């Protein structure tokens, strides 16, 4: 599964894991992305999205219809 949020565009960041002795090794910081299904009344069907928890809060705030409308304008395939 992709670790990119379809709503916010959050993608993995890269940095270092620093041990107690301060040795640095490369690591990846993944966003908290989940696969969720929403019913969109304006489309009359369910839509499955890869969405981060921040994206879920955005959907709670703005509503799924407004978020899906913006995704369709961006050209995201639903």
From Swiss-Prot:
One of its GO terms (biological process) is translation. The keyword Cell inner membrane does not apply. One of its GO terms (molecular function) is structural constituent of ribosome. It comes from the Bacteria. PANTHER family: 39S RIBOSOMAL PROTEIN L28, MITOCHONDRIAL, LARGE RIBOSOMAL SUBUNIT PROTEIN BL28M. Belongs to the bacterial ribosomal protein bL28 family. This is Large ribosomal subunit protein bL28. The lineage of its organism: Bacteria, Bacillati, Actinomycetota, Actinomycetes, Micrococcales. The gene is rpmB.
């Amino acid at each position: 599964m992709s670790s990119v949020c379809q709503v916010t565009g959050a993608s993995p960041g890269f940095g270092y894991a620093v041990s107690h002795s301060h040795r640095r090794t490369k690591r990846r910081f993944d966003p908290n992305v989940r696969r969720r299904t929403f019913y969109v009344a304006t489309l009359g069907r369910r839509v499955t999205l890869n969405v981060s928890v921040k994206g879920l809060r955005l959907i709670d705030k703005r509503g799924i219809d407004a978020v899906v409308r913006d995704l369709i304008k961006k050209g995201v395939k639903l």
